[in-house]
């Protein structure tokens, strides 16, 4: 069973907080963009409500390296941290080509530069829909080659609540 759970709907304005997501797929528990929130309990309580301890999280996926998306990585001490360029675990840094890299059987990274050159999108084929966790702030000179909106039924942007893509 593959499921996607919004733990925290992000926002941007006078304050900033990232959208934080849990993906369950096979043996993988993936947290997406554990960034800035007003209180860490806004991440930990929804996780506990799903029966997930922070120590059980297997992967943390970072869409890019800005603090508003990364500041709470340490909440997940056993997780492998994955971005578009590499995987990080303890003191290991393993370079990889992230385009098409699979974190789990039904989740895949896509290079989608826009907000930053290393922006990546996590596309998940869940049981109920295809989800894209992506930043959605593109600069004109960094338009991605692939459109995560075209592939998804539901988009969870880096800052904001999920929305359905009309096709």
Model region roles, listed by residue range:
Residues 1-27, 100, 106, 148-154, ...:
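Zn-dependent metallo-beta-lactamase
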Residues 1-49, 120-136:
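Conserved beta-strand hairpin/beta-sheet module of binuclear metal-dependent hydrolase folds
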Residues 5-7, 61, 82, 110, ...:
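Hydrophobic/aromatic beta-strand patches that form the interior of the parallel beta-sheet core
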Residues 11-15, 34-105:
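Active-site HxH/HxHxD metal-binding segment of metal-dependent hydrolases
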Residues 26-27, 73-80, 105, 127-128, ...:
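Short glycine/proline-enriched coil/turn segments at helix->beta-strand junctions
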Residues 29-30, 56-59, 153:
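Short active-site oxyanion
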Residues 32, 63, 82-83, 114, ...:
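Active-site flanking residues adjacent to catalytic metal/cofactor-binding acidic residues
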Residues 37-38, 111, 117-167:
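Metallo-beta-lactamase
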